[in-house]
Amino acid sequence: MKRFMAAAIAVMALAALPALASEATFERNLSVSGQVELTVSTGSGHIHITQGAGNQVHVYGHVKSNWGSDSEERVKEIAANPPIEQTGNIIRIGGHHENYHNISIDYDVQAPANSFLEASSGSGDVNVAGVGENAKLSTGSGSIHATGLKGGFTVNTGSGDIYAEQTGDGDVKAQTGSGRIELKDIRGSLRAGTGSGDIKVNGSPVGDWRLETGSGSIEFTPGNTGFTLDASTGSGTVRTEHEMAVQGSFDKHHIVGKINGGGPTVRIQTGSGDVRIL
């Protein structure tokens, strides 16, 4: 009897659930004739952008609805009329998130390498490979992985790791509320910060740098670049593998001095963690 009652309760519980997830896909090819200004946004879903042909933008979308009695109809409607707008070489993908309650859209996009790029997700990872001049990448919750970014760029996530590689010169900003930051081949000014997580950077500080974490270690590899170092930790040690002309403080928690003859100021600070200049 007990087994029968348990089975009956389980059946009734399943019957009470809303309709299961629905999904659909769409593809579009957009012809372009010059440098593209590309914006991609989704309220919930991932964004993957890779290098494609120089005369077109290819969009593949995956629409999903978690629950809802009319979910299948809504998903099919979005797939039939995806949120894509084109005016010449200006392309906007996504937007109108307020109309997509309980619906997420993943975007996989191929675009010309020199496209001006802005990509944002409310919740989901953002991955970029070989595309983006002066890129702006953000997600509310998720990781960012970007390579081949041309010129300056800005990357920001509320919670998640950041990995980015720069090609050429330009100013860089990288921020995460909680997560690790790794930046490679940076040439320009830099501001990188995380509330909790390690920071690892290599590059040439041709402008001032500021690296900050509330809790975590910081590692900086400058090569032969000259700069002025001001590094401190609340709990941990500061060490450098380079010869340095000391200017003021020099102890295990705080050092100030010129490396390779000095230059732009590199300020490094962690509340709890070690600092290494390699």
Regions found by a protein language model. Name each.
Residues 1-278:
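Intrinsically disordered, low-complexity terminal regions
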